Amino acid sequence: MTRRQFIPLAGIAATAGYASLKLQKPPKLSDGPPGNSAVSIVRARSYSEDLVSHMLEGVRQCGLEARGKRVLLKPNLVEFSSTTVINTDASIIAAAVELFHRLGASEVKIGEGPGHRRDTLDLADDAGYRSTIPKFESLFTDLNRDDVAPIQGFAGEPEFYFAKTVLAADLIVSLAKMKTHHWAGATLSMKNFFG
């Protein structure tokens, strides 16, 4: 085959391959309607209390089953200043890791992708995550740098891209930090899945 014969054939093959990829629909995030979210509020007077026991009480109130599931913990890590408390405290995350291991989760990961400061590991260090959470580096994924995959879209969009760590999780637990917010008044948990 000559070069003149090869180039048009290669172009046709590449176009056909690209077209077949575009015709495949990306997977859906869920096949069914959204389920109900369970919320439990359990009081701990300080971060030095037995947080695992408090969390276990909350999980039981919600009827949450974690055995054999891949769990992704999503803290709220924005930026760090020693004069503010805007991030999920490291002791909360450490307790949640221990809790889901005790409950038989097959895997527990921590995933975060801050929108303000882009060096997530430096931010995690400043917030005390690496020094407080056992095996932090092996548990943590920077969602800003994670590989992504498309899912079937909604609201008129053909598809959305999500971090593969998020898509691989059977259970995503928001460990949001309740705080005031200059636009919304209070953030509660509504913004925690943005970054």
What are these regions (language model features)?
Residues 1-195:
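N-terminal and secondary-structure boundary signal
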